[in-house]
Amino acid sequence: MKQFFLGFLFVAAAAVSSFAQGSQPKLEAVPKVELDRYLGKWYEIAKYPNKFQKQCVGNTTATYSQKQNGRLELLNECLKKDGTMEAAKGEAKIADKQTNSKLKVRFAPGFISFLPFVWANYWVIDLAPDYSYAVIGEPGRDYFWILAREPEMDDATYQQILRRAESMGFSPGRVEKTPQGVETIRGGVLNRT
């Protein structure tokens, strides 16, 4: 139930934020995403802090797989402060089939998937040519993630991504790095990397 509520909050907030773009420049997604290259496991390198990931202290990953109905299955996992892993399953549908770079995601149960407000924008706004990293955002600029195929990213690449994101209207000052390779001991976080 908690996962449903957190997923519902994300989708509702993203839906509301898409109406509140204000004077931001129009956000553009990348010209093309090859879905079979995008599938698989991604490590969260950094993000805008958000309510539905508040319990996560590190080791955050997102795994995408193709479903028979053409949609994508999402599995987001993270380490919590108590040392347990939290997992949230979701689904994505392609919103722009010409580019595959604009998706709609939901973590709400399937039986309410007919409601438009349970689906949130998930746009690939930056992508390495070799698919070693991807940057996710949405038109309201309320959500932002940097994902990579490896748990660490060199600082030069990270800074270049932040500069490009800033030119798109995102705020680098809001971005927080996500620790990978961490453990928890008695409620504290120990970074092993």
PLM segments and residue spans:
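Positively charged n-region of N-terminal signal peptides that target proteins for export
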Residues: 1-4
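A beta-rich soluble binding module of mature secreted/lumenal proteins
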Residues: 7, 16-193
